[in-house]
Amino acid sequence: MFNNLKPAIAAFALAASLALNAQAAEVTGAGATFIFPAMSKWSSDYNKATKNKINYQSIGSGGGIAQIKAGTVDFGSSDAPLKVGDLTASGLAQFPSAMGAVVPVINLPGMKAGQVRFTGPLLADIFLGKITKWNDPAIAAVNPGVTFPDLKITVVHRSDGSGTTFNWVNYLSKVSLDWREKVGEGTSVKWPAGLGGKGNEGVA
């Protein structure tokens, strides 16, 4: 983990849109995978206190937004906040329910936690596919004294509509003009490099 990058890529507050159906014996929701562990605990506590159930499906922020707009669930959750115009047009309310951070991690044999450092532009170049080897001079330049193997870098990212993706590419767009012009921002982008996994569990 690269702790020095945490403040720069802190996630937006999770936005939850609530449809008015408070009398339902079972409340249904869908959306961000990021909040699923907390949602599971809240659902359990809510059930103990009220005897009512919350059925939350962690299908990704994009799916949650689509379902709450379609009216197929009582609430949706997304790491990427909706704009005021979008909320008004859909008749939705939005409020923050949790906050988290997106932190890049690596799986490189022989490296200790916190040993490898990156800059924002360097991360952008890796995700753009411009830097493909661990022993690239650009990586070595910001990691003096660290010897990197001649191994290919395999980038892993979300394949589904994701608030985690939104937060990550929003950061890359701020630190890299090349990323901003070629890829841009959104809950779903055309990734220049890497393998896609569905949900945070798929990436892990």
Functional labels for PLM-detected ranges:
Residues 24-204:
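Flexible loop/hinge segments at secondary-structure junctions
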